[in-house]
Structure formats: structure tokens, C-alpha cells
């Protein structure tokens, strides 16, 4: 492996900013001679210049958490201060890239070193300086114009899906003294020069932002548009909004990763940031393998999904401390695209691994442990992460709205939801998609348990549904009632058997089975069912509930007459209708199209009505 090509830190005041290693304990290093350093300042530890961050200061002693393997660091090694907090580079080139937890570009490092491992102390800029981007300045901006933080002063077509808007960093303002003409520039070329109070400042297309700091916005707005996931059980029963927070807790093998990957593939978001935090490396390689092949249709053109996705990979065999950084890196990238006016979804898979990293570092610092050994500030850290979600009015001109939705997978040990991470998360998030091991063992996927899951956004979304799908809200209420009734009846059935139930109860059981097997269950690996558009979800639910209502009415109306209609008579006479109801999910939205599917469902509804009429006559 040739390390000579990798750049080292070069700093004029290098000697003035040097402390010395005093002790090493795993990823935690103590350094002396650090007077004047700041909390969360970035430092370089040892002769290999390992990346670290100051997490505690006492006198001239600093405690540093190192984001790389510390073997070989010895007492007396230099600790170089950079004077900057841990920051990320924000600019063209993020989409389609894969970074590690501290935004080092993995593909660039592998090209440089010809190795599958990241060498220690590597210092490669996150965004390539060699690529030229086609920059177009804003039409209404000229020399002498006034410009303030968040204003868009140019556009770069990053790819055919993402128009990358070049914004002025939030804290800058001034009068334009130079703006670059349209043309090809790389990320180190100056494209804008401002003067403010006699001081001139130059700007490139890249801005640097500290990861622990929230990017400012004009105001936070209430969320009112659903995040459509393409999973029927989530869209119909437990919807999330664009700008919402969601937790997916579940034991191993329940399908958390499949749900978060299908969200990344099919949800109605403009940008996806997928953070693999302490999960298996195979899952990230699966994403890298699947996403470039997956396509979506935009304005009649077929595009690769990878063009709207950025990956932050911090697998379980990478240093523990960097897991914490990867979550912050991911959310900062999300906020940057939100500020352009995009709807961003961030998948964090999984926040439990992040909490475990906090626990390990906290243990090394000899802090007082709380529940299960986690630090006392676990809840505060989780809250400060989830609170960065939301729908906002972005800073600067032109006026625009953006949102960040956070979907956090949680892996409680043994599937125990009373685990501190799960209970702290549930106190913060608004949507809970609880995965059930028993459903997963019965091969019922997505294994979302409809009895324990909930969404607090249903009220906020009622207005949207009333406007676009008027019949949907009562349908959802009815479906939940049927599923709840079925759960109550299940105990009676086990005691006395199905035969001794009332006719209406038999119908409830039958329709609940229909809803569970042919509506809530969904095969994510088939072309017809991997993504279910909302019109198809509503159409299917509408016919199933209509079937329930008609059956119930038929049984109740003829209960006193001589020719009683019972559950078994309906089942014998309507086997074809039942078969068509169970086959509704096989309609392919891509091949058949919306008009044909809606017409087929309407036809089925008509045939159902006619069948019940003739049965009653």
C-alpha cells in the first residue's frame, strides 16, 4: 500500500498548536499542554495524524475521542490542534457518493491506495477538486446587488435528477463585487466575491459546516403532506408526514433494513441520505449493488435511484467513535439539501448501535452509568438528533420550503421494547412502526404489528386526505376496528371454536383474515407488489370494507326471515368475488397503469353489489 500519495495536514502555525499524548484507553486519548483548545475542536493525534475530537477539558488536559484505530499511539506523541470543529463539506458531488462517518470519500481513498481498507490518518477532501461543474449564476444577480445568508446565487446540474442550488453560507452577507459568468468550474474556483463593511470575501461552490450545529431556518412550519412509502400497512394505517420522525424497532430478522431500504427506493422524497451506523457491511454493499440498478420515472425519463441518494457507511467493523459522527454527518447533509427546497428522507440504521458507541465512550470516561449502562444523557442526545427533523421555510431568497424526515431503526436486544434506547426514542418520535418477531416467523412481511404501532400524524393529514381521497379516513377507521375486533374474538375462538360464534363475528374473522393476508402483507421482491401507489391502496381497502359492509347487511337483514343468509352461504356463492378480492394486489401499477386499475376495482365493486342483490332476491 503506497501512503506517499496521501496528503498530510500542512499548517504554518503547526508548532504553536501542539499538545502531547498523556494516556490512551481504546478510542479515548488524554492529551496535555492543550490550554486554549475548545470543546468539540478537531485534533490530529500521533505521528499518523489520526482524526479526533475534544470531548472534555480540564485545565490544560483534554480528552479526545479518536475516530480511527489508536493502536501504535504512544505517550509523548504530538496532538495537533486545527482550531476548527468537526465539519463537513457541502457542495456539488455529494449525490451518488459514499462517505464514511467523518465524510471521507471511500471510492476516492480506494482509488488512491489500491486497498480495500482505509489507511489511518488519511486526509482526502470530501468533494473532488478535479471535477468541473457547469455553473449558471442567478439571473437577477449582478455586481452591486445585495445578498444575504441562504440566498441562491447559482445553479449546478449535479445530475439529471438533482439541481444543486449554490447558496451563500447562512452567516455571510454583503454587496456583490464579482460573480462568475456561466461556465465550467471546479469546487476550488472562486465564483462569488462580496464586500461587507470594507472587507472583501471570496466564495467557492463549497461551504463548510460544523456537524453538531443546526443549520438556521426562517421558521418551522407544521407538516401536512404524507410521506408515501409504497408499503400499504404504513401508508394506510400508520402514515408519516414529510418532515416527521419515525422509529422502527424490531428484533433481528424482522425486516427493519428491508423497510428502510424500500423507503429509500420508493418514497416520495427528492433526496435520500442513508446512514448505515454500526450495521453489517453486507447491508451497505447490498444498497450499493441494488440502488444503481433500480430506476424511477421522472417526466417520462427513466433515471437511476442512486442519483438522488448519498450513503454514509459506518459498518460494525469500523471504529466505534465514528458511529456518533456518522449520525451527525448524515443529518447535516440532509439539512443542506433541505435548505435548497428539497424534501429529504434520512434513514439511520440503526440508532441502537450509535447508543452503544455512546455507552462505550461514556464507560471509558468513567462517567456515572444510568439504565443498562447507557449514559444519563442518552435521551438528550437522541432528542437533539430527532429534533433536527421538520418542515421549514428556508433561509434566504427566493422563498422556498423544504423538509427533513428521519426514520430511525432501533435494534433492541432480544426484541425487548422496554430497552432504554427504544423507550427514550418512543418518547421523542411521533410515529412508531413496531415490528413483531411472531409475524416475521409466520413469514408475514412487512412484519408491522398493527395492534402496537401508532401514528400521531393522522389528525394533521386528515385535511390532505379529505382533499384528495375523500372516502379514505372512514375506511381506515373501519379497518382498524375490524382488526381490533378480530384480536378480541381470537381468544373466544380458541376456547369454544369458530362454529359457535355469531354469524356477524364469523364475517369479521373472515374479512380480518382477508385484510391481513391480502392487504397488510406485501412481497417486496415482486414487480407488482414492491411498491403500492396510494390510489391502489385506497382502492383495495375500499373494496374490502365494502364487502364487509354488504355481507354484514345481508346477514342482518335476513336474520328474521325464513331464507336466512349465513356466512357459509355467502362463502359458497361468492367464491369468485372472494378470489378477485384476494387477487387485487396482483395488479401491476407500472404495466397496467392507474386508469385500468381504478376501472378494474370499480368493476369489482359493481359485481359485488349485483351478487349480493341476486343473493338477497
UniProtKB/Swiss-Prot annotation:
**GO biological process assignments:** ATP metabolic process; cellular response to increased oxygen levels; intracellular iron ion homeostasis; proton transmembrane transport
Query: Which Gene Ontology cellular-component terms appear in the entry?
Result: cytoplasm; vacuolar proton-transporting V-type ATPase, V1 domain
Enzyme nomenclature, EC number: 7.1.2.2
Q: Where does it mainly reside?
A: cytoplasm
**Annotated SUPFAM superfamilies:** C-terminal domain of alpha and beta subunits of F1 ATP synthase (SSF47917), N-terminal domain of alpha and beta subunits of F1 ATP synthase (SSF50615), P-loop containing nucleoside triphosphate hydrolases (SSF52540)
Pfam families xrefs: ATP-synt_ab, ATP-synt_ab_N, ATP-synt_ab_Xtn, ATP-synt_VA_C
Which CDD domains does the UniProt entry name for this protein? ATP-synt_V_A-type_alpha_C, ATP-synt_V_A-type_alpha_N, V_A-ATPase_A
**Positions that bind ATP:** 250-257
Reply yes or no: does the keyword NADP apply: no
* Localization per Swiss-Prot or TrEMBL: Cytoplasm
Output the InterPro entries linked to this UniProt entry: ATP-synt_VA_C, ATP-synth_a_Xtn, ATP_synth_asu-like_sf, ATPase_a/bsu_AS, ATPase_F1/V1/A1_a/bsu_N, ATPase_F1/V1/A1_a/bsu_N_sf, ATPase_F1/V1/A1_a/bsu_nucl-bd, ATPase_F1/V1_b/a_C
Assigned keywords, A-Z: ATP-binding, Cytoplasm, Hydrogen ion transport, Ion transport, Nucleotide-binding, Translocase, Transport
Report the GO molecular function annotations: ATP binding; ATP hydrolysis activity; proton-transporting ATPase activity, rotational mechanism
Family label: Belongs to the ATPase alpha/beta chains family.
| Quaternary structure (record) | V-ATPase is a heteromultimeric enzyme made up of two complexes: the ATP-hydrolytic V1 complex and the proton translocation V0 complex. The V1 complex consists of three catalytic AB heterodimers that form a heterohexamer, three peripheral stalks each consisting of EG heterodimers, one central rotor including subunits D and F, and the regulatory subunits C and H. The proton translocation complex V0 consists of the proton transport subunit a, a ring of proteolipid subunits c9c'', rotary subunit d, subunits e and f, and two accessory subunits.
This protein is called V-type proton ATPase catalytic subunit A
Q: To which species is this protein native? A: Gallus gallus
Gene expressing this chain: ATP6V1A
Amino acid at each position: 500500500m503506497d501512503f506517499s500519495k496521501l496528503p498530510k495536514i500542512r499548517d504554518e502555525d503547526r508548532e504553536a498548536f501542539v499538545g502531547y499524548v498523556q494516556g490512551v484507553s481504546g478510542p479515548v486519548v488524554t492529551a496535555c499542554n492543550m490550554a486554549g483548545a475548545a470543546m468539540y475542536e478537531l485534533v490530529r493525534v500521533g505521528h499518523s495524524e489520526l482524526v479526533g475530537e475534544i470531548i472534555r477539558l480540564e485545565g490544560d488536559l483534554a480528552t479526545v475521542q479518536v475516530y480511527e484505530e489508536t493502536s501504535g499511539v504512544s505517550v509523548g506523541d504530538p496532538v495537533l490542534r486545527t482550531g476548527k470543529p468537526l465539519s463537513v463539506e457541502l457542495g456539488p458531488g455529494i449525490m451518488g457518493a459514499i462517505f464514511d462517518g467523518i465524510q471521507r470519500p471511500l471510492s476516492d481513498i480506494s482509488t488512491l491506495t489500491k486497498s480495500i481498507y482505509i489507511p489511518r490518518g488519511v486526509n482526502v477532501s470530501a468533494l473532488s477538486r478535479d471535477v468541473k461543474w457547469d455553473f449558471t449564476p442567478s439571473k437577477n444577480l449582478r455586481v452591486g446587488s445585495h445578498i444575504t445568508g441562504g440566498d441562491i446565487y447559482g445553479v449546478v446540474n449535479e445530475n439529471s435528477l438533482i439541481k444543486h442550488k449554490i447558496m451563500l453560507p447562512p452567516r455571510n452577507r454583503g454587496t456583490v463585487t464579482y460573480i462568475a459568468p456561466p461556465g465550467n468550474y471546479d469546487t476550488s474556483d472562486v465564483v462569488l466575491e462580496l464586500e461587507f463593511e470594507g472587507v472583501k470575501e471570496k466564495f467557492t461552490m463549497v461551504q463548510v459546516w460544523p456537524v453538531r450545529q443546526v443549520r438556521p431556518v426562517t421558521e418551522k412550519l407544521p407538516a401536512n403532506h404524507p410521506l408515501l412509502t409504497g408499503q400499504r400497512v404504513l401508508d394506510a394505517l400508520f402514515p408519516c408526514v414529510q418532515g416527521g420522525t419515525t422509529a422502527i424497532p424490531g428484533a433481528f430478522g424482522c425486516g427493519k433494513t428491508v423497510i428502510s431500504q424500500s423507503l429509500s427506493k420508493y418514497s416520495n422524497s427528492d433526496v435520500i441520505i442513508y446512514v448505515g451506523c454500526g450495521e453489517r457491511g453486507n447491508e451497505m454493499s447490498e444498497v450499493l449493488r441494488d440502488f444503481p440498478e433500480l430506476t424511477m420515472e421522472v417526466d417520462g425519463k427513466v433515471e437511476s435511484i442512486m442519483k438522488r441518494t448519498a450513503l454514509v457507511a459506518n459498518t460494525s467493523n469500523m471504529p466505534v467513535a465514528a458511529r456518533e459522527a456518522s449520525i451527525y454527518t448524515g443529518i447535516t447533509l440532509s439539512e443542506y439539501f433541505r435548505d435548497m427546497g428539497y424534501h429529504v428522507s434520512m434513514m439511520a440504521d440503526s440508532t441502537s448501535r450509535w447508543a452503544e458507541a455512546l455507552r462505550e465512550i461514556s464507560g471509558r470516561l468513567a462517567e456515572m452509568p444510568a439504565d443498562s449502562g447507557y449514559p444519563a444523557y442518552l435521551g438528550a442526545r437522541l432528542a437533539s438528533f430527532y429534533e433536527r427533523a421538520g418542515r421549514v421555510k428556508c433561509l434566504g431568497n427566493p422563498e422556498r420550503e423544504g423538509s427533513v424526515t428521519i426514520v430511525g431503526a432501533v435494534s433492541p436486544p432480544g426484541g425487548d421494547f422496554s430497552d432504554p434506547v427504544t423507550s427514550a426514542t418512543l418518547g421523542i418520535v411521533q410515529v412508531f412502526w413496531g415490528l413483531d418477531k411472531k409475524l416475521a416467523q409466520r413469514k408475514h412481511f412487512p412484519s408491522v404489528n398493527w395492534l402496537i404501532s401508532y401514528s400521531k400524524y393522522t389528525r394533521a393529514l386528515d385535511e390532505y386526505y379529505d382533499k384528495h381521497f375523500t372516502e379514505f379516513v372512514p375506511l381506515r377507521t373501519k379497518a382498524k376496528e375490524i382488526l381490533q375486533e378480530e384480536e378480541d374474538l381470537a381468544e373466544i375462538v380458541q376456547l369454544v371454536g369458530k362454529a359457535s360464534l355469531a354469524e356477524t363475528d364469523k364475517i369479521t374473522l373472515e374479512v380480518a383474515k382477508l385484510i391481513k393476508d391480502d392487504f397488510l402483507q406485501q412481497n417486496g421482491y415482486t414487480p407488482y407488489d414492491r411498491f403500492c401507489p396510494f390510489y391502489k391502496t385506497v382502492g383495495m381497502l375500499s373494496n374490502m370494507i365494502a364487502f364487509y359492509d354488504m355481507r354484514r347487511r345481508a346477514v342482518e337483514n335476513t336474520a328474521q326471515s325464513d331464507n336466512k343468509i349465513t356466512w357459509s352461504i355467502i362463502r359458497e356463492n361468492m367464491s369468485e368475488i372472494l378470489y378477485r378480492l384476494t387477487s387485487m394486489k396482483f395488479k401491476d401499477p407500472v404495466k397496467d397503469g392507474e386508469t385500468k386499475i381504478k376501472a378494474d376495482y370499480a368493476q369489482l365493486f359493481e359485481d359485488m353489489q349485483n351478487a349480493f342483490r341476486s343473493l338477497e332476491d
